Amino acid sequence: MIMIRIWNNYKGKYRFFLSNCRSFSSIKRPQIPESEETSLSITQRRFDPDLAPIKTRVYVSLFHTLFRLYLSCERLYGAARTLSAMCTFGVVPDSRLWNSLIHQFNVNGLVHDQVSLIYSKMIACGVSPDVFALNVLIHSFCKVGRLSFAISLLRNRVISIDTVTYNTVISGLCEHGLADEAYQFLSEMVKMGILPDTVSYNTLIDGFCKVGNFVRAKALVDEISELNLITHTILLSSYYNLHAIEEAYRDMVMSGFDPDVVTFSSIINRLCKGGKVLEGGLLLREMEEMSVYPNHVTYTTLVDSLFKANIYRHALALYSQMVVRGIPVDLVVYTVLMDGLFKAGDLREAEKTFKMLLEDNQVPNVVTYTALVDGLCKAGDLSSAEFIITQMLEKSVIPNVVTYSSMINGYVKKGMLEEAVSLLRKMEDQNVVPNGFTYGTVIDGLFKAGKEEMAIELSKEMRLIGVEENNYILDALVNHLKRIGRIKEVKGLVKDMVSKGVTLDQINYTSLIDVFFKGGDEEAALAWAEEMQERGMPWDVVSYNVLISGMLKFGKVGADWAYKGMREKGIEPDIATFNIMMNSQRKQGDSEGILKLWDKMKSCGIKPSLMSCNIVVGMLCENGKMEEAIHILNQMMLMEIHPNLTTYRIFLDTSSKHKRADAIFKTHETLLSYGIKLSRQVYNTLIATLCKLGMTKKAAMVMGDMEARGFIPDTVTFNSLMHGYFVGSHVRKALSTYSVMMEAGISPNVATYNTIIRGLSDAGLIKEVDKWLSEMKSRGMRPDDFTYNALISGQAKIGNMKGSMTIYCEMIADGLVPKTSTYNVLISEFANVGKMLQARELLKEMGKRGVSPNTSTYCTMISGLCKLCTHPDVEWNKKAMYLAEAKGLLKEMVEEKGYIPCNQTIYWISAAFSKPGMKVDAERFLKECYKKKNARSSNS
């Protein structure tokens, strides 16, 4: 109590601020406002002449006691303030106190920014750092991948370095897959007169094993005069992956070592990190057969890995086994269990686990609280997460960068960008320096929200305070370029980031594979996949899903191959895997394949998602199997999967094929009985379905019912009605509907004007089109690709090729890329009048702009060329050229793209190729076409 009173008496006298002392590096830190809770700052030392030597000794003793008390309670910022207070009273803390604090900050995960800040204050206080402090600082930089800083500190000759210094740098390089670079430090150590020890060699052996270079690892083993248990454990765990465990085990036993629980736990840990969780489980059984019994570390490693691999049942079963066997459950186990339950989506059980650990007299630390905050944020319960952070501060458990980053991630996911940026500033106020992940999350959120300028400013600020660009930032920038369609810039961006020292990780590679597959660059996507494989990056279910999605899209593999390949790699497919494969089968029209995958998914114990159900229902409806589709609906109800708007649309589209209003209304009522609730979206879907068939009277009745039930029609409702009137050629009614909409105070959108422009163009009222286009622009709306497509089609219908091309040029100048259908209209215009040169140029334009031709494009081009070949006025040499071009396009269409020519195109092919010497080629091509056509019709 005396100590606390003395502390409180002098508490008001302390001024804490960030000193302007020269740091050990050239990084300039921003002036951060002081915080009473977390400030680490030091005032200029002042000596009080009135303090007697005896009194000084009392204060020194009290400060030392207070410092140790704070450290024992893990209240590190309190310990830091104590050292600051000592300096204020002219009592310089010795290096042991500084070293203890630096060490604790490092082991508690409060990475390099806080460690380096304490290190700077130590120097400012006039205490020279020793090799221990330097080693901790280097380790903190290695942990976050700032290897260049770590190496520069190693080579700073101001402080004498030792074996531990080199081993720390070697370990950091090996952890980041840079074993070759780490090996070079062995010779440097010898030159410095520092001999490598067993730790040096074991670290390098482990590093080479991790990157798959077992030859170099074995060579290092031969260099060691005496192998220890750790060396054998490293080799054993690495050779397990190569199925050569017998050889490594034999070497270990011959050296006089028996594998113990640590050895097996290390192997299990290595397997789990490599994604081979099931093999880790098998090894758990094997170790028990050898009378080596797992401890809580073994169980915790496996439980954590099973949760991360989404194998929740096995994880919980293993935890139960651990409890039954009487293995004590500590804070780490509780934290892993709680985190895993959050990942499994079991929010209630996760919260119960937290209550259990409190009832078990466990004291939550920053890691436990962070797992709780992260889980709550991912579950969308931000208010509870905010409450937990407040509770942490009340209990003097200071949130770290991971805690705040989790909270910021939660805000960003909810679109609460102002709160995210505000918390980022609060972190700086509390001397918790944001890391690359924190900045990356906010930058990515700003990009997604279209706030590009703010995102770029934040990335500049990040670099200014010394946070290097890293994997998270790279991922945010890559995703931004993907969203805005600037795929070509991605390679340059990656090259630039790698040159700055960013090492691509599994997530980066997965993103790059996804970006290039979606951008249509199959070759680049596969090149990134190959590089990922060569670098020894582990494949998980997410990265494999991206790969098979792209390969299925480009027709490189089948669903069976994808499933088999995944199992061979030891990766268990998840619901997303099955959805990808089923969706691919649906596009190919393989209904049997979809049903096989549906059954296989359920046999694997994977519960279908709503997306899975919609794929199966959609396939059955497309094939006219309504009864079977209803059967799937019944299964959905049993699995407590409720149909959504997509399900509703699938059934309504199918019923509309009969072109009978009673069938559509019957389906509507059926879906309502299965849990679809009436809403504006449901009414709009029903009205749109009726209007597509021109059933505007029925649609108007539905709209009346909609209003009677309290659902106010919106722009979508009126757009559908206008479209229906245009389909039925009721142009005046369509335009009067627009007037009604405006009178009701409902604002038109781009789709409204597109509907009117398309309807008027189809009716041949081109002069009216110009008037509506002007009104659209006067309301500040820019024409989009649909607008231009309608305008070009309208000009084409009246035979105005010049007008069509003028609008096409305007479209390009406006920065829009025409769709395939737009190009088809233009190509058809030129082909119909025999201007194949212009048609050919447009086809080339499609290629340059990344627009893929479809069946209609090829048929138009081939038919046009074949027509010219049969024309009597065309010269023979030009006929030969047209014929060769038609043949090339036909080959590309059938053999490369897998498209089948329509009957009219086949007629013109027959006419053109029926000349002497051409019949054999014609017959071969036509046989192939008919074979493919028959195969496709039989599948459907």
Swiss-Prot record:
A cellular component annotation (GO) from this entry: mitochondrion
Keyword Mitochondrion in record: yes
Spans of repeat PPR: 59-93, 94-129, 130-161, 162-196, 197-231, 241-259, 260-294, 295-329, 330-364, 365-399, 400-434, 435-469, 470-504, 505-539, 540-573, 574-608, 609-643, 644-678, 679-713, 714-748, 749-783, 784-818, 819-853, 854-891
Highest taxon listed in the record's lineage: Eukaryota
This protein's UniProt keywords: Mitochondrion, Repeat, Transit peptide
Cellular location(s): Mitochondrion
Pfam family, one: PPR_2
Predominant subcellular localization, coarse grouping: mitochondrion
UniProt record similarity statement: Belongs to the PPR family. P subfamily.
PANTHER family named in the record: OS03G0856100 PROTEIN, PENTACOTRIPEPTIDE-REPEAT REGION OF PRORP DOMAIN-CONTAINING PROTEIN
Name by which UniProt lists this protein: Pentatricopeptide repeat-containing protein At5g14770, mitochondrial
Naturally occurring in which organism (per UniProt): Arabidopsis thaliana
